Amino acid sequence: MRGLRLATMTKAPTSLAHWGAFTADVRDGDIASVRPIEGDEDPSPLLGNLPGSLRHSSRIAGPAVRRGWLDDGPGPSSRRGADEFVAVSWDDLTELLAGELRRIVDTHGNEAIYGGSYGWASAGRFHHAQSQVHRFLKMLGGYTFSRHSYSLGATGVIMPRVVGTHDDLFKRSTEWNVIAEHTDLLVCFGGVGLKNTGLNHGGTTAHPARNALRRFRDRGGRIVSFSPLRDDVDGDCEWLANVPGTDVAIMLALAHVLATESLVDRAFLDVYCTGYERFERYLLGVDDGVPKSPQWASAICGLSADLLTDLARRMAANRTIVTVSWSLQRVRHGEQAPWMGLTLAAMLGQIGLPGGGFGHGYGSINETGLAPLRCRLPVFPQGLNPVQTFIPVAAVSDMLLHPGEAYDYNGLRLTYPDIKCVYWAGGNPFHHHQNIPRLRRALARPDTIVVHDPYWTAMAKHADIVV
């Protein structure tokens, strides 16, 4: 919005935020109200946070440098997050930042700059903060980067080995309209939280999930929700409050019923899958002597064996989608839930049929269930990174606290680099990173932290140079 002359405008053009498309009404140089784009059947109420945001007290008024860094120069500091900031001119900031980047590159090499810069700063493509900072750092000679996401760290590693890229898994998911018209039974591990469908990376112009589920129910469709939370599904459902973390045991029990009652679609497995025979040996306990039966799972998950047996039979008798929320893979051994969910759906043999199959992310983000784009949208080119060093995105604290230490990732033996500069644009790891006190200790280690942001987020307050 900085490029708009808001003081002289009364109506801004249509804009796109993560929560949807909208038109802003402007008064006295600030956003007075917003109106969702016409045709959005269930606009997100979070758009209501935009009024007043341009002049909010948390806005960063201009470039600033942390007092300790300005007085003492670059170096590790436990004062980050508590020190005061000094306003500087754009010319002075540019000179300070350029000099520090050149010092780090000349002394330690480009690998010493961490530019993962994870965050959701902008729904636009040209104004996408990560794209801009990555392009900038590549032009500088490269940087240590990050892979995958906090939302889908385990999925991003396992699913390409099982079914293809997880990106295609979401973009080619069964559309909500197809579910409303064809699905009989929606079996949800982790629920379908409609609150999460309010937003989408890159923005969105439609929120179809709520009305699609209403039409699904009106047609007689049933929802089974495995979750410790009743409101993980909006409206009527069969809520099964299993012990948290036992979803894979439940899936195995359902698969056991299919296998022992001849409900497996062998023809589908023979044509489209490989490895079922090996999996079935484990499922039936041939090698370890432990059949993964409903009775076995009942002692683990807290649900009755009869209930699980009945559900498996209903799944085989109806057009069924097995959906696994992203939350299930954000734990240790998180790769097991989406992998087993897909296996269960393959045993039913309904993948590819209207209203049947597997889903991963319904109720986790708005994209899952949207009609796919017919062509790829343009993106801002970033160029090539000469530095090949990377970390899994959620390992930033480990990297800063243990430089030079070896670790295992996705079949590789890697080493954490020695980072001297953390460069972040439009992101705030304090709102999604695990173990915040440990993150604070880690951020005391680099020589310099640079943050680009319009607001004084926790990350901006831990910076040395704020742009």
Model-inferred region functions:
Residues M1-L263:
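N-terminal export/assembly segments and adjacent metallocofactor-ligating motifs
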Residues H108-A112, V264-L269, G352-G359:
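Flexible, glycine/charged-enriched surface loops at secondary-structure junctions
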Residues G109, A123, L303-A305, T309, ...:
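Gly/Pro-rich turn-and-neighbor structural signature
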Residues Y118, V271-G275, R314, G357-G369:
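A glycine-rich phosphate-binding loop feature that marks nucleotide/adenosyl-phosphate handling sites
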Residues A129-R215, R219-F226, A249-L252, A346-H462:
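Extended redox/cofactor-interaction regions of prokaryotic respiratory oxidoreductases
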